[in-house]
Amino acid sequence: ALSIKTDYADAIWNRSLAYLSLKDFNTGWAQYDKRWKQSNNTSIPFQSSKPYWTPNKSGRVLIWPEQGLGDLIMFSSVIPEIYKQSKKLIIQIDDRLIPLFKRSFPTDIIYYGVKEKITEEQYDFHIPIGSLPLYFRKELQSFKHNNGPYLKADTSRADNLRSKLLSDGTKNLIGISWHSTN
């Protein structure tokens, strides 16, 4: 397809996913931004006159959401790294994830739900959360920055659930996972 139409966004997007699956992160993430131009894209990019954040820019950085909950959770592994490079970090995220993120990341990060208004006076630069790996996950070694769990469960809820599940004497517990369709 790309030999016929070199700028065919769907093919470039699919190629980026292929590169990522082959662990060629540098090439895969470099082409990942074509997701905005693919024919079945339903995400609307954040509109702002402020510039995109890049690693050489220091200031107040707004990270805005895209894709589904699973993607937001996956990309959030990079938050500690961009936090270190920003003067102030502001994250707009699905409301359901705010408590989890508040437990898991530095306490001075500011969070907004997806329906809350953020004005351009509040930030200097912005970036979609799915674009962060372009700067922080270029090689397999870069994933080692997270040498353990990066999300923290609500220990009270987890303990209550564990007690409830174990109260009937059952020895085997089965975890649940989901698969997103977006």
Task: Give, region by region, the residue ranges found by the protein language model.
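Alpha-helical solenoid repeat scaffolds of the TPR/TPR-like class and their adjacent stem/linker regions
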Residues: 1-182
